[in-house]
From Swiss-Prot:
Belongs to the MnmG family. It is found in: Cytoplasm. It comes from Brucella abortus (strain 2308). It comes from the Bacteria. GO terms for cellular component: cytosol. NAD-binding protein involved in the addition of a carboxymethylaminomethyl (cmnm) group at the wobble position (U34) of certain tRNAs, forming tRNA-cmnm(5)s(2)U34. This is tRNA uridine 5-carboxymethylaminomethyl modification enzyme MnmG. The keyword NAD applies. One of its GO terms (molecular function) is flavin adenine dinucleotide binding. Its cofactor is FAD.
């Protein structure tokens, strides 16, 4: 191979964080010759902030990443040291799988998977510039002068884009503690005409677990039967740990109030907006000052690591104030601070600059994923990375992009929210953001998305076999339970209370009743005992939601019709009589591709949508007439 060939790729991914790893893996699985550009190999897969994966809404994203044969679920299963299923007592649609992770195990597992991936080369170095041929991306220039040629680039800069760390009055450029920021790329993005903004996130101090008084604290255990994230994981083998729970005190709050003027957040030093749902401890005291305390989870960062992450006291106060605060918190009175908490500001691009493929509208072949799009969280980043990497590979190959709809996946909900509404603060996923969350459950992510992964060529043979085995078992169990039926009278003999309407009900129908599970039906039909535990749970959940799913299908059909109604690229919004000048301007700026996208433009009314649909039909009629006229002239 010549040196020129060695520096030529189909796809280049910049950044080795959660978005970058998923992007690089997806592009390589799609058949693209891929380069992952990162400063150092040993920082690939580093968990910059909290040592945890999943949670409410976020756990759904991890399951969807896994269903598309991504990495995060498998890596989390290898590194997880405290698995807990959140909202266990609520319905399956809103349950959130979560695990604390051993930072070292997570990083090493991710690095191993990146190393083993075919078609993927890790290139150590800093990305200094993007190379374009006209309005199309053509390569990346590294800080050492090397130029890598490519057909598409995925930019996953995280908090490194003009990153600035704040600790009280101190501030210094960094991508995260101890690592340099990316300083040149923002200028290049501005030169392309992108709209950049500033966002902020923060992290708590790190503590020496050997100096914490664990005996005085309440402890929280892992689930007795850990539920893995990945279809590929048979069982969790990593030892499980406990976490400590403590609270801030009125004395803590007094110290924070007395030093607010020294906090970077409240002194005016930070212009970026922080995440609403992960507030700093200063924010908690200012906004919820009437509370006598705020909960703190003390999360060990590893099985052989004494570092503890105090989840709940993210701060940008000076280090001396952080030490004072620790002395007022039960169990932490003598805790040694290993690293101060800090806030970090960074550049992001208005995600309305993106198509739903995560390709930028202004530069062909340039894709963005992760915090550069205004999101917060490993899971949100990983999900975007997978979609961007897949579509970058398809762009390089000249194929049509993959678009996930709101009706198909939480990934589709997130991307649609970002590209249609933009962000005013860091975006995080919640189940409440999805209109169709009864069908977008964590437990059925494989059924929803694995066939798509197979169709677009990113599914391994091993996963295909495992998926088909599980689906075959579920299909057989469904068929068996639908073939068995019972009358209300006979059901009463087995203490099943049904309406005495004379209607026979199948075992599958009975599973939709809240007080009936498979264990109760085995007394009637002993053959059901042969259904394995995994299939049993899937069948019970499916049957439980079957009635609701039938009702929801009509709503899904309406949205899918709107998604299919395309807005022609040549449509003149200014020519639509009755549309306000404000809406005309917003539509020209946003350039929605479907009626569904147009409906989510701020200020769009039902009347405006009707006008737009009428104009599309009129435009389509003119196009058809023009085509017929051309055909007639050709025939003459």
């Amino acid at each position: 191979m010549s040196s020129a060939e060695a520096l030529a790729f189909d796809v280049i991914v910049i950044g080795g964080g959660h978005a970058g790893c998923e992007a690089a893996s997806a592009a390589a699985r799609a058949g693209a010759r891929t380069a992952l550009v990162t400063h150092r190999f040993d920082t690939i897969g580093v968990m910059s902030c909290n040592p945890a994966i999943g949670g409410l809404g976020k756990g759904h994203l991890v399951r969807e990443i896994d269903a598309l044969d991504g990495l995060m679920g498998r890596v989390a299963d290898r590194a997880g040291i405290q698995f807990r299923l959140l909202n266990r007592r609520k319905g399956p649609a809103v349950r959130g799988p979560r695990t604390q992770a051993d930072r070292k195990l997570y990083r090493l597992a991710m690095q191993q998977m990146i190393t083993e991936q075919e078609n993927l080369t890790v290139v150590e170095g800093g990305a200094a510039d993007l190379v374009c041929d006209g309005e199309r991306i053509s390569g990346v220039t590294l800080a050492d002068g090397r130029v890598l040629k490519c057909g598409a680039v995925v930019l996953t800069t995280g908090t490194f884009l003009n990153g600035l760390i704040h600790i009280g009055e101190k501030r210094f450029p960094a991508g995260r503690m101890g690592e340099k920021p990316a300083l040149g790329l923002s200028e290049r993005l501005l030169s392309f005409g992108f709209t950049l903004g500033r966002l902020k996130t923060g992290t708590p101090p790190r503590l020496d677990g050997r100096t914490i008084d664990w005996q005085s604290l309440d402890m929280q255990s892992a689930d007795e039967e850990p539920v893995p994230f990945s279809l590929m994981t048979d069982r969790i083998t990593t030892p499980q740990i406990e976490c400590g729970i403590t609270r801030t005190t009125p004395e803590t709050h007094d110290i924070i109030r007395a030093n607010l003027h020294r906090s970077a957040m409240y002194s005016g030093s930070i212009e970026g907006i922080g995440p609403r749902y992960c507030p700093s401890v200063e924010d908690k005291i200012v906004k919820f000052g009437d509370r006598d305390g705020h909960q703190i989870f003390l999360e060990p960062e590893g099985l052989d690591d004494d570092t503890v992450y105090p989840n709940g006291i993210s701060t940008s106060l000076p280090e001396d104030v952080q030490l004072e605060i620790l002395k007022t918190i039960p169990g932490l009175e003598k805790a040694v601070l290993l690293q101060p908490g800090y806030a970090i500001e960074y550049d992001f691009i208005d995600p309305r600059e993106l198509k739903r493929s995560l390709e930028t509208r202004k530069v062909c072949g340039l894709f963005l994923a992760g915090q550069i799009n205004g999101t917060t969280g490993y899971e949100e980043a990983g999900a975007q990375g997978l979609l961007a990497g897949l579509n970058a590979a398809r762009r390089a190959a000249g194929s049509e992009p993959v678009i996930l709809q709101r009706t198909e996946a939480y990934i589709g909900v997130m991307v649609d929210d970002l590209t249609s509404r933009g962000v005013s603060e860091p975006y995080r996923m919640f189940t409440s953001r999805a209109e169709f969350r009864l069908s977008l459950r964590a437990d059925n992510a494989d059924q929803r998305l694995t066939p798509l992964a197979d169709e677009v060529g990113i599914l391994s043979e091993e996963r295909r076999k495992r998926y088909l085995t599980r689906e075959t078992a579920l299909s057989h169990a469904r068929m068996v339970t639908q073939s068995l039926s019972i009358t209300p009278n006979l059901a009463g003999y087995y203490d099943l209370r049904l309406n005495q309407d004379g209607v026979r009900r199948s075992a599958y129908d009975l599973l939709s009743y809240p007080d009936i599970n498979l264990d109760r039906l085995i007394a009637i039909w002993p053959e059901l005992a042969s259904i394995d535990p995994v299939t049993r749970e899937a069948l019970e959940i499916e049957a439980q939601y079957a009635v609701y799913m039938e009702r929801q299908q009509s709503d899904i059909a309406v949205m899918e019709r709107e998604e299919r109604l395309l807005i022609p690229s040549g449509l003149d919004f200014d020519a639509i009589s009755g549309l306000s000048n404000e809406l005309k301007q917003k539509l020209k700026q946003r350039k929605p591709e479907t009626i569904a996208e147009a409906q989510r433009v701020d200020g769009m009314t039902p009347a405006a949508v009707a006008l737009l649909i009428a104009q599309i039909r009129k435009f389509g009629g003119r196009q058809k007439l023009a085509a017929e006229t051309l055909e007639g002239k050709g025939a003459a």
